[in-house]
Amino acid sequence: MEGNFLNNPWINCCFVTTYAGVVAQYFKKGAEWFNFTTPSIGTFTNEQNEEDSSNYSTSGYDSSAETISANSSPINRSGVRSRISQKQRQRILKEAHFKAQQLNRKMVVQKSCPPDHEIKPVPSKFYQFDAITDFGFGGPVLLVGMQKDVEVMKLETKEKARSGRKKNRKSKYKCNMYKMTKLAQIVAKIPKKKEVIEIDEDGFQKVSSKKAAKLRTLKPADVPTPPTKVVENKEEVIKLEVIEQPEPIVLPVSTPTVTFSRFEEMKRVVKVEKAQESAKTKALKKSKAISISRHVGFLQILEKLEETEEKPQVENEKKVVVKHVQSARKNQKKGRKNRKVEPPKEEFEPYEEDHYNFKRYFLIIGVYVLVFIYVCTNVLTVGVSYEFPYITLANKNVRAINSTLPKSVNESSFLIR
């Protein structure tokens, strides 16, 4: 046992409360002036009296009449909140830990220590009760708290590993581009083995291994230059020749004086076309335009227009054909594909109503005649008179008689003529 009996760790709260009650009755004053509290560890109260007091606050637990107040009742407890969240709890614990560290620094007694040492607080193993004789109200005040011991520890300094220079964050695309460029630079620095290229007399590369070597672009000095013949490319001069059209063949066709539409005009041309075919082939063989086969359709249209229109109009059409031939030759020189101009399709003239009706009636009459002839050949014999119904009946009777007679008798002798 140390100096004061209150330092005994086995003294419990029951003894302290009874002791406080006896003291209160002795002074005959109510318990309002006396506050018995549980120690709130880590809260510093008295900075002046460091030697006498334990420097801990005792304002956490009240044994006075305030505990029976209306605020502490569960009904009138309007300020009580629900359970705090995890974030709030973590923040409160962090703040409490920070305050505890500050208090520990203040509680440390400045003792003489060597320069390489440091003073660190170490908590005691049990609660230590201290009775302080302060007569604020004419009587003693009991403070209960925990005291912390202080030890001198050797200072250990550890050098922190310094990290490299921080780079600015880049986007994923830029990072990949940076890597690609870096790899390309590294690959470019790697020296490549130069392959010896051997060339034959014919100018081909020799391949020694099984795998064919990759052909590379050789310098002009290394490549053997075969003898070349310089040929001057003469520019092709195309002379546009006017196509000589054959003289129009005049046929004995009655030219109408009335102006026709284009459709009627084409119908009339189609009628004359067969008569002109023989003359056209002879004329085309003589002309120079037979070599350009794709423009035969235009020439045929020209010849058809010659028959119907006057000569000045034909000359205008000739100029159009010449221009078309010129453009076709230019396109042929450039290498473009020209579409073949197909000749106009023959449009047959439909039958007129009178001719159509006449043929229809003629066919119907012919069918009736054929049916009549067929009936006559099967029912009547040769040389039938106009009264054929009666004769047919008589002939049937005669045939019935002949069927009973022998075959030697001639059947035709009994027929009615």
UniProtKB/Swiss-Prot annotation:
Q: Where is the composition biased (Polar residues)?
A: 65-76
Q: How does it sit in the membrane?
A: Single-pass membrane protein
Report the subcellular localization.
Answer: Membrane
List the biased-composition ranges (Low complexity): 54-64
Can you tell which superkingdom this protein's organism belongs to?
A: Eukaryota
Q: Where does this chain mainly localize?
A: membrane
- Could you tell me what this protein is called? Uncharacterized protein B0310.3
Q: Where is this region: Disordered?
A: 44-83, 325-346
> Which spans are transmembrane here?
362-382
Task: Give any Gene Ontology cellular component.
Answer: membrane
- Asked if the Swiss-Prot or TrEMBL record annotates the protein with the keyword Amino-acid biosynthesis, the reply is no
Q: Where is the composition biased (Basic residues)?
A: 326-339
Per the UniProt record, the source organism is Caenorhabditis elegans
Provide this UniProt record's keywords sorted from A to Z.
Membrane, Transmembrane, Transmembrane helix
